[in-house]
């Protein structure tokens, strides 16, 4: 999953792997 600007969304969809 791509990293979102929103850290919460990034964590949910990308396991905070930005």
From Swiss-Prot:
Gene Ontology terms for molecular function: toxin activity
InterPro entries cross-referenced by the UniProt entry: Insecticidal_knottin-like_sf, Toxin_28
Superkingdom, natural source: Eukaryota
Stated name of the protein: Mu-segestritoxin-Sf1i
Any Pfam family: Toxin_28
Primary residence: secreted
Domain comment as written in the entry: The presence of a 'disulfide through disulfide knot' structurally defines this protein as a knottin.
Processing after translation: Contains 4 disulfide bonds.
Subcellular location: Secreted
Family, as annotated: Belongs to the neurotoxin 16 (SFI) family.
GO cellular component: extracellular region
Function: Insecticidal toxin. Causes flaccid paralysis followed by death when injected into Heliothis virescens larvae. Does not induce any toxic effects when injected intravenously into adult mice at a dose of 1.1 mg/kg body weight.
Tissue expression notes: Expressed by the venom gland.
Alphabetical UniProt keywords: Disulfide bond, Secreted, Toxin
Disulfide bonds: none
Source organism per UniProt: Segestria florentina
């Amino acid at each position: 999953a791509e990293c979102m600007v929103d850290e919460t969304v990034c964590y949910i969809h990308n396991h905070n792997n930005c």
